[in-house]
A protein has these predicted regions:
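Tryptophan-anchored aromatic micro-motifs
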Residues: 65-89, 109, 168-174
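Charged, amphipathic alpha-helical segments
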Residues: 58, 90-92, 150-155
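Beta-strand elements of well-folded, non-transmembrane domains
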Residues: 77-81, 98-102, 111-113, 139-141, ...
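Cytosol-/stroma-facing membrane-proximal "stalk/adaptor" domains immediately downstream
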Residues: 117-213
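Amphipathic/hydrophobic helical signal segments and adjacent flexible N-terminal regions
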Residues: 1-70, 78-81, 183-213
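Beta-strand secondary-structure signal
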Residues: 70-74, 95-97, 106-108, 132-134, ...
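N-terminal glycine/threonine-rich, aromatic-flanked beta-hairpin/loop signature
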Residues: 85-126
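Generic detector of short, locally flexible boundary/turn motifs and exposed helical patches
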Residues: 35-42, 62-63, 71-74, 86, ...
């Protein structure tokens, strides 16, 4: 979105320059046009590079403060659901995968029984300076779990810790009137396609402060 706005700005400047030249009757020189074209191309390339990767650089994030969440997180879900025998469901091992650019973020949450994918997600900074990841999701139970759980929607939010080891913690709510707590304290830069492979992996580590890591 930012790169589009920048290209539009350059285009408007070119049009204004062209209109003024036509109104004053001045001859049009190709040199300024080449200059504006080169400037527009440069702005577009830099904006694209920032959107995809430059924003992740430590030095850049020290100025922007944007937390780096991109990667795979490992933790657990504590749900309000009660089993048929009346006992609460034990904590559920879970894996959170975050895809992040400078302006966009998407979230997928995997457990042994289901996969949740975000339909809308955003990274927000609160009045107290803390960052929060919020998203709306659709949960699709795996075939073996559909007798006890149906497809449903919900919302979730995770507050981002500020010191090593705090990780991500928050809660979720669903349209089935269930809710629960989410906690993720281990992180890996790799992308995993299932909960089982991520939970068995050995390359996860406790997280560090994100704006400075």
């Amino acid at each position: 979105m930012k790169d589009i706005r920048q290209q539009i700005t350059v285009g408007i400047v070119c049009l204004v320059w062209l209109a003024l030249a036509l109104l004053t009757g001045e001859a049009l020189s190709p040199a300024p046009l080449r200059l504006f074209s080169a400037a527009g191309t440069t702005v577009a390339i830099v904006a694209l590079a920032y959107e995809r990767s430059l924003w992740q650089w430590k030095l850049v994030r020290r100025f922007t403060g944007i937390p780096l969440l991109h990667g795979t997180w490992r933790g657990e879900v504590v749900t309000s659901v009660i089993r048929e025998d009346g006992d609460p469901v034990p904590p559920i091992p879970a894996v959170l995968h975050v895809v992040q650019s400078a302006s966009r973020v998407s979230v997928s949450l995997f457990t042994a029984d289901s996969v949740s994918t975000s339909t809308h997600a955003s990274l927000l900074r609160g009045d107290d300076g803390r960052w929060c990841l919020r998203w709306q999701f659709t949960n699709q139970p795996r075939p073996g779990a559909r007798q006890r759980s149906q497809r449903h929607r919900g919302v979730a939010e995770l507050w981002i810790g500020a010191v090593p080891g705090e990780g991500l913690s928050g809660e979720y709510f669903t349209d089935r009137r269930t809710y629960g707590e989410l906690t993720f304290v281990e992180w890996s830069p790799r992308r995993y396609g299932s909960a089982s492979t991520a939970l068995a992996a050995t390359d996860f580590a406790l997280v560090a402060p994100y704006a400075a890591s």
